[in-house]
Amino acid sequence: MKASRFFIGTLKEAPADAEIVSHKLMVRAGMIRRVAGGIYNYLPVGLRSIRKVEAIVREEMNRAGAIELLMPAVQPAELWQESGRWEQYGPELLRFKDRKDNDFVIGPTHEEVVTDIARNQIKSYRQMPVNFYQIQTKFRDEIRPRFGVMRGREFIMKDAYSFDKDAAGLNESYRKMYDAYVRIFSRLGLEFRAVAADSGSIGGNFSHEFHVIADTGEDAIAYCPTSEFAANVEAAEALPLIAERAAPAEAMEKVATPGKAKCEAVAELLSIPLERTIKSIVLATDNEGAEPTIWLVMLRGDHDLNEIKVSKLPGLKNHRFATEQEIVEWFGTPPGYLGPVGTKKPVKVIADRTVANMSDFVVGANEVDYHIAGVNWGRDLPEPDVADVRNVKKGDPSPDGKGVIDICRGIEVGHVFQLGTKYSEAMGATFLDESGKPQPMLMGCYGVGITRILGAAIEQNFDDRGIIWPESIAPFEVVLCPMGYDRSDLVRETADKLYAELVAAGIDVILDDRGERPGVMFADWELIGVPHRLVIGERGLKEGKIEYQGRRDAEATLLPADTAAATVAEKIRAALAH
């Protein structure tokens, strides 16, 4: 590719609405331009990287035995009504009517459409396993699109859907996709972690997320540096931090805590560790035609509630936070001084695992400006229902018993689910088994955010000059920067020869023949993030040398002109192999 025949739309300044590095650099590097909120044009530089991501994803999906198809972006409402998601999905689902007043949606996912394909095309167990995938544009009407391609409304995604006759088959399909994702993100040259996760609105039983590690990531990941354990903080099991409850050592005592409504303030006033205080959180579940059930969830003062874990407990699937009016009615006091001792009306108490093993702890007295110290289970309170209801935190024991938890930030770029029969039962996707009896198909679903990967890769790979692409997804692998291409025959002939050698070696190279000043050339290609640069100058050529600099290198080095192309080609092959 010659730069004079390519579109390079670099900018010196980022737009005012760009908040994070990837958004700023994608605009400045001429990769994207905003059309509307969360909707972008992908300019030639950006599209080249997208196509490279797609190629790797496609190769690994095919290698894993998945079969490519293409489903429509526009889907009839009837399919979503069959699955139940027409009512369940919120305003993120873009709905519209055609000229005949029929309801349609712009697909954010394709579970319904692919299940419709399966129920019409798969009739026998002999036709399974099968795994369909597509790479397609989707739309989710985010309430507040931001961060460029990281949380856009329109995005490109690879989604795959497996169909199996039994659980063993589903497990095998899931394993193949999991392994394929590990290969994909390894080939993309990204630091990533596969983490156990909650299935969210997609539904299903078993789930892993793939996160690119980045300080700007929206998700907190709990992992163990000395083992294989990794999980989304929402899904990570929080082990009890006290192995065995100690015998009571204090008498229960009401203490004045004027104006101290927070655990930290109470601990400071009483000169006790924060770990001896209890955080009381009041939840409610509604009962048709009757007053709500009120739940008191007890956490250690330094711990945070995990609502996803709570929602999986019996009776709490549709919980909400209690209103202040309900809190006063059941406890006799506003929030800040709540506790399980002496409530006005009966409440259901759930203690986190760590709280259940505590003794001599401090709780609210259900009276403004007072707490109760020296509280103990069995003596002062009945034994509680016990559950894991908190987020893990740094320093907790790892659930696999092989070390302690650390926390990092990640950007979700892939997700694999075992859906089971959630959609096949709802939509009647059955097959005849070996005995001729109809059975629901077991499904898995597997997504990769193609355009999101670009943003995540940049968040992990940049400096103050611009993007630093991994070789596998860089818009170009090498840029040739000739000094005086239009003035020096020697420079032009050498640059053209290098270009031909690199093309022949299968290297994705661009020759900057625009006639720009060196500073402009260097700034453009450093901003765009091309991993390798060769500078061809007349002075160096007279000594048989060409200047080479990798995008991550602090200094340039000189290479023999006659072997420069081969040297750079080998560097690229080594990077891709690694």
Curated annotation (Swiss-Prot):
Complex formation: Homodimer.
* SUPFAM superfamilies with a match to the protein in the record: Class II aaRS ABD-related (SSF52954), Class II aaRS and biotin synthetases (SSF55681), YbaK/ProRS associated domain (SSF55826)
Q: Which organism is it from?
A: Burkholderia cenocepacia (strain ATCC BAA-245 / DSM 16553 / LMG 16656 / NCTC 13227 / J2315 / CF5610) (Burkholderia cepacia (strain J2315))
- Please give the record's comment on domains: Consists of three domains: the N-terminal catalytic domain, the editing domain and the C-terminal anticodon-binding domain.
Q: Which Pfam families match?
A: HGTP_anticodon, tRNA-synt_2b, tRNA_edit
UniProt-recorded name of the protein: Proline--tRNA ligase
Q: GO MF terms on file? A: aminoacyl-tRNA deacylase activity; ATP binding; proline-tRNA ligase activity
As for subcellular location, the record says: Cytoplasm
In the UniProt record, the signal sequence range is none
Gene encoding the protein: proS
Family annotation (PANTHER family) = MITOCHONDRIAL RIBOSOME PROTEIN L39/PROLYL-TRNA LIGASE FAMILY MEMBER (PTHR42753), PROLINE--TRNA LIGASE (PTHR42753:SF2)
Q: What is the lineage of its organism?
A: Bacteria, Pseudomonadati, Pseudomonadota, Betaproteobacteria, Burkholderiales
Spell out the reaction equation it catalyses. Answer: tRNA(Pro) + L-proline + ATP = L-prolyl-tRNA(Pro) + AMP + diphosphate
EC annotation?
Answer: 6.1.1.15
